[in-house]
Each structure stands twice: as structure tokens, then as C-alpha cells.
A protein has these predicted regions:
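Long, low-complexity, Lys/Arg-enriched
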Residues: 92, 105-106, 297-303, 311, ...
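Short amphipathic alpha-helix with an adjacent loop that forms part of the alpha/beta core around
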Residues: 7-8, 56-65, 120-128, 287-292, ...
Length: 680
């Protein structure tokens, strides 16, 4: 949008400009006299003067009669600014636009397809590249990306790491960003220069600038991943014999950028233009340097930033092609409805892991139906189940340690994966994968008519003979040919003895026990408790119908309480988690005379088991990355965010046909449900 168009929107109203960088200086030189500018706003400074205008706090804007705020920043930064001051603007009836005329108070509707996204296709990129003699690539968010929501999240993660070492720099992340922005007004700084400014403004020398810079570099380097489809394009251009240049705005040295490129196998490029080495950015004269180096050659630049990569390269006579960053795709889909739940760095890391996985490929919108999709069960585990299962595992571990339990039983088969995650925490709590099932516990726990009546109160979808066989392990052709209750109680005595043999082999200590079950009323725990002399407390993901067990004297604490079912989305989607949390062997039905588990006949195919394994590997990969990236002190539970991630399994297109053939099994009740019906 040209200024005159923006001026038509503003009219003669008083305005404030947000931003005090060099682009603001340029804007004021060209347009300052044409507009009624009251002052400048900034995220760090709220007083002083610059470019002949006062810097004022946003709280004073309404009293000064300002009706418009114009944000002068890159599109990606505009969004962050709008989030920061949007509510203030709405509450004070102040319009908020960027310098390109975009209304920053407009809310993008949530979508699960790319129909409203217009972008160049891979085919168009290849055509443009064929006509170019030199091809320049941006680096960050184009060839590589970070496993965080924004590069500034690196500062918050580093702050957590420093605090865990006893190094506290108040407002560290704010100082770090301000130093970078302030120094960049003159020319792109090196990371060491940024930290010299940080230490100066923070008023201390906890580390040297070099040490802090090295720690940030190592952290950032560990957060990077390659955008595989863009690398494929890069490699194809190298194979075509094109001259390739990497043109990047960065505070890292040329040697460090080379390390990044080497890590991900980027070879065959001819030159590397690093802004802080040349003392000029892409928004300044870096593209002039590129043009001069290849004078007379037709150059194509490929990057993600609308302003720095596309507009600025074009202003230097360079052709440009935009590659969508993961953040841009996320924004274009209205943040998929999850963005409102973000409140801390833990949430931002979760979002970052999600974006890095689902939007790694910038050409997603080229698919025929343009729906957001996932290709494999491992993605389902990682993207949709990983956040919820991670928060639950951390909650359970914290609860067990805080309450003084030093041993925990992970009941089969739900506990198969959870125990693996528990091991990754390297906790001192002794843990045992405990072979059991609702059926096995019931068979070993039958001691009275009341027990039989309790089990019979739970409806079974089958004949009386089938009920007796499936639930109690007694096989007869005619239920009337035996004394049913006596047979059940006798079976219970024998199974109790067999189970004690199994327990003795485990070598469980004499202290109180924590017991894991995933989604349950408490039946399994109730009957297992009879096999142990010590107290047992259940730690469940979700307890169903707790009022049904109120008179059973059970000690149970649940991650999700039943009373919250009306306000929580988990009750619509936990079946998906329950299906994936299984083991690679059938349900156990009882113990043999030597205390070894006996299993029912496997009903799942090898293909089904491979699907479960892939989904569980995805969850484990997510958990491992989350633990690696975020210090323990910064990990925060957020069920609402987790629920929204999980609910997305109903919104995206699942391309793994093997996953879609799975069935949700419940042998105890004689029920089988297609997974397609569960995920709607």
C-alpha cells in the first residue's frame, strides 16, 4: 500500500509510530511532514527523544488524542507487536496498522486447509531458477529452522539455563533483544558485541561476553533442523551447475554459519554473505554486495521474509521467490486455534516442536485438496499425543516424588510406553512394569459374593457362557451345568496364589506403592491391592465415575478429574491416547502355576503392531526433545494447550492408511470400535 492510500485511511487524525529503528528514521525523512505524528513508541524505551520526536509510553497515547498507531517493522515482528498492544488498542478505540496498510487488529480465522494461501509452487521455483544464472538462498527459516516458536525464545531458554547455574541477570531476554535491536541501527552486530552491551546495561560481569555468546551459540545450534524439501531444491540446483550463494542476516560468524551448513549437508555453494561480517544487512546494502559480486548476471534470491528477502532484493534488481516459514503458515491458518493458550516459554517450546514437524515442508499447500495433513503414525504420536502424554508423565513423576513414594508399578499394557518415558527422567524411584489387566486382577481378586456381584454389574456384550469365559477364565458349554459362584471363587484362590509367585519374583520392596493406570474407575487397583500388604495409591490419567468407587476405600489421584468433563475436551479424545498406549503383546488374562503371565490370542496384525510402534516412537521423540530443550525449572503443565493439540487429530487429514484401519479394543466389555469412528 502506498502512503497516499494509508493517508486516506488515517485522514488528519493524530498518529504514533511504533518502532525506533532505521526504517522509522527513513519513514520520517520521507513522510514526517505529511502526517500528524505525536511521538514514537517502543517495546523497550518509554522516554527520551530520537529523530526529532519524543519517545512516549503507550499509556499516554489516549490522552494525546492518538487514533492510529502505525507499526514500522518487518511483518513477523508486526504480529508480535500486535499481540503485545492489541488489547490496549481495542480498549481505547485506537486503530493499529503496519506501514504496508495491514490492519493488525484483524484476526485470521482458524483454518485447516491452505485455500486462502497464495504462494509460488515448487514447479514455479524450478522455472525461475532455470532462468537464473546465480541463485541466492536465505538461511534461517528458509534452509533451516529452529525448534522454537520464535528466535527470541532462545533467549528465554538461555535465561533458564543461566538461572539453574545460579547466574541471574534480571530481565535477561529483554536486555538481550534490546541490545541486538539497538546495535543494529548502525550495522549488524556480532554476537559478542551484543553481549558486551547486555553486560553493560545489566550492570554486572557474571560471565564474559565471549562466554555468554558461546553458550547462546551452542544452544541455538542444538535447536536447528533442516527443511528437507528446501534442501532437496538446493541440491537439485547444485546438480544443475547453478552458482549458489547463501545470503543471511545474522550475528554469527562466517565460520559458525559454515558449521550450520556442514551439519545439514549443504555443499556446493560458491559464496557466503554474512551480514555481520560485511557490516550491512539485507535491509541495507547486502544485496548490493551480492549484485556487485555477480555483476551482469541474472540473480534469483529465495527467502521467507516479505520485506528483507522479497522487497529488498527486488529493489536491487534481483528476482525473488518467497518460501513460507513455518510461522507464516501457522499464522495463515489462524494459529490452528491453539495460539490463545500460550502463556510461557514452556508453551512456546511446545508450539515450536509442533511447527518444526508439521510445517517443515513449505510446499504443503500444493496438495490437491490443500488440507493440512500428516503422513505417518509417528507424526500423530509426536504432534497430537506427545504434548499431553509429556505433561501427564511429568505430573505423575512430580506427584510421586513429592508424596514420598519410592516405588511405582506401571500396569500393563497402558504402562508400557509410560514406563519408558519415566526411565528417560532418570528418577531415583524404583519402577516395575507390572503384568496385569482388569481381567487378570479380577480373576485373582474374587473373594466373596459381593465381588462377583460387582463384576456382574458391568455389562458384557455376549452370552452368559461367554461372560464366564472372558471375565473369569471358566469355559463351559452350559452355564447351568456348574455352580457358577463357587467356580469363580475357587478360581480366585488359585489365581491369587499364582499372582503372589509373580510378585515375589519382582523383588518389590516393603514401602508404599504408587500404581499407574491410564483411564479407569479403579477396579484393577482394587483387586491388586489385595495382593499386597502395603498401601497402594493410584496415579491415573483419568478416573471415570469416581462416585462408583466411593465406598471401595481406594486411594486415587487423577491428572483429570471426572467432575471436569463438561469443560474439558479430553473426554472427547482420550480414546485416541488409550488406543496408542499399548504393548506389543496381547492382553494378559491370568497367571500360570509358576507365576508367569498367560495371554489371550493376539487379535492385532503385525501391521497394527508396527503402527503402534511408530506412534509410540513419535511420542518418545517428542518427550526427549522437550526434556532436552527445556530445563526442569521451566517446564509447565498446560492441559488446555495439550487438549487443543490432541483435538487437531480430528481436523487434519491422516494419510497413514494403516493407522486408519486400527480398532479400539475392550475385551472385558466385548467391544470393538473402528479408530475412524473415534476420530470423527
Amino acid at each position: 500500500m502506498e502512503l497516499y492510500e494509508l493517508k486516506n485511511i488515517i485522514g488528519n487524525n493524530k498518529i504514533a509510530l511504533y518502532g525506533i529503528g532505521t526504517e522509522t528514521e527513513r519513514f520520517l525523512k520521507e513522510n514526517g511532514k505529511k502526517l500528524s505524528i505525536v511521538g514514537l513508541l517502543d517495546g523497550f524505551k518509554s522516554d527520551g527523544e530520537i529523530y526529532g520526536y519524543p519517545i512516549i509510553p503507550i499509556s499516554e497515547i489516549p490522552a494525546k488524542g492518538v487514533k492510529f498507531i502505525i507499526v514500522i517493522a518487518r511483518p513477523g515482528s508486526c504480529k508480535a507487536i500486535a499481540k503485545r498492544i492489541g488489547d490496549f488498542c481495542r480498549g481505547n478505540d485506537i486503530a493499529l496498522f503496519d506501514v504496508r496498510g495491514r490492519n493488525l487488529l484483524d484476526v485470521t480465522a482458524v483454518a485447516y486447509d491452505f485455500r486462502n494461501i497464495s504462494g509460488g509452487s515448487r514447479k514455479e521455483l524450478i522455472k525461475m531458477a532455470a532462468e537464473a544464472e546465480v541463485i541466492s538462498f536465505d538461511l534461517f527459516d528458509t534452509l533451516v529452522m529452529r525448534k522454537v516458536m520464535s528466535y527470541t525464545d532462545v533467549f528465554d531458554i538461555l535465561d533458564c539455563q543461566l538461572r539453574d547455574k545460579g547466574i541471574i541477570i534480571p530481565d535477561f531476554a529483554k536486555h538481550r533483544l534490546f541490545a541486538e535491536k539497538n546495535l543494529s541501527k548502525e550495522k549488524p552486530p556480532r554476537l559478542e558485541q551484543i553481549y558486551e552491551a547486555v553486560l553493560s546495561s545489566a550492570g554486572g560481569a557474571f560471565f564474559s561476553a565471549e562466554e555468554l555468546a558461546e553458550q547462546e551459540w551452542q544452544l541455538d545450534f542444538s535447536l536447528l533442523s533442516v527443511r528437507e524439501s528446501v534442501k532437496d531444491v538446493f541440491d537439485s540446483f547444485v546438480s544443475m551447475g547453478k552458482r549458489i550463494v547463501i545470503t543471511t542476516d545474522t550475528y554469527y560468524s562466517k565460520q559458525q554459519i559454515t558449521e550450520i551448513l556442514d551439519k545439514f549437508g549443504f555443499h556446493g555453494y560458491d559464496d557466503l554473505l554474512v551480514s555481520c561480517e560485511y557490516g550491512t544487512a539485507k535491509t541495507q546494502e547486502l544485496f548490493s554486495i551480492l549484485s556487485d559480486k555477480f555483476s551482469g548476471k541474472r540473480i534469483l534470491h529465495i527467502g521467507d521474509d516479505e520485506f528483507a528477502d522479497i522487497e529488498k532484493s527486488g529493489s536491487h534488481g534481483i528476482d525473488a521467490f518467497r518460501i513460507y516459514s513455518a510461522a507464516a503458515l501457522f499464522d495463515a491458518l489462524g494459529g490452528l486455534g491453539v495460539e490463545d493458550e500460550i502463556s510461557n516459554i514452556s508453551d512456546r517450546v511446545k508450539i515450536g516442536l509442533f511447527l518444526e514437524r508439521i510445517f517443515n515442508d513449505p510446499f504443503l499447500f500444493e496438495d490437491e485438496d490443500q488440507r493440512l495433513s500428516v503422513k505417518d503414525a509417528s507424526d500423530i504420536g509426536y504432534l497430537f499425543c506427545g504434548p499431553m502424554i509429556s505433561d501427564f508423565t511429568l505430573w505423575m513423576n512430580d506427584s510421586i516424588e513429592r508424596q514420598g513414594y519410592d516405588q511405582v508399578l506401571f500396569g500393563a499394557r497402558d504402562g508400557y510406553l509410560i514406563e519408558k518415558l519415566f526411565q528417560m527422567l532418570r528418577t531415583s524411584t524404583s519402577h516395575y512394569y507390572f503384568h496385569t489387566s482388569r481381567t487378570a486382577a479380577i480373576r485373582a481378586g474374587m473373594e466373596s459374593q459381593d465381588d462377583i456381584d460387582y463384576v456382574d454389574s458391568m455389562k458384557f456384550f455376549g452370552s452368559p457362557e461367554e461372560t464366564l469365559k472372558v471375565r473369569f477364565g471358566i469355559d463351559v458349554n452350559d452355564i447351568n451345568s456348574i455352580d457358577r459362584n463357587s467356580a469363580i471363587l475357587e478360581k480366585g484362590k488359585q489365581q491369587g496364589k499364582n499372582y503372589h509367585k509373580y510378585i515375589d519374583k519382582l523383588g518389590i520392596g516393603g514401602g508404599d506403592l504408587a500404581f499407574f493406570d491410564f483411564v479407569a474407575k479403579g477396579t484393577t487397583q482394587m483387586y491388586l491391592q489385595r495382593l499386597f500388604s502395603q498401601h497402594m495409591k493410584g496415579f491415573y490419567f483419568l478416573q471415570l465415575e469416581p462416585e462408583f468407587m466411593a465406598d471401595k476405600d481406594l486411594d486415587i489421584e487423577a491428572f483429570y478429574a471426572d467432575e471436569g468433563k463438561d469443560s474439558s475436551a479430553i473426554f472427547d479424545n482420550y480414546y485416541i491416547l488409550e488406543t496408542i498406549l499399548t504393548a506389543p503383546y496381547p492382553q494378559m488374562e491370568e497367571m500360570d502355576d509358576d507365576g508367569n503371565p498367560i495371554y489371550v490370542k493376539e487379535t492385532r496384525s503385525d501391521r497394527d503392531l508396527r503402527v503402534f510402534d511408530r506412534a509410540q516412537c513419535g511420542i518418545m521423540e517428542y518427550f526427549e526433545e522437550y526434556l532436552r530443550i527445556l530445563a526442569e525449572s521451566a517446564r509447565k503443565e498446560n492441559k488446555k494447550l495439550d487438549e487443543k493439540f490432541l483435538a487437531l487429530v480430528n481436523k487434519v487429514k491422516i494419510l497413514d492408511e494403516d493407522f486408519l484401519t486400527l480398532k479400539v479394543e475392550d475385551p472385558f466389555f466385548g467391544r470393538m470400535t473402528d479408530i475412524k469412528d473415534v476420530i470423527g
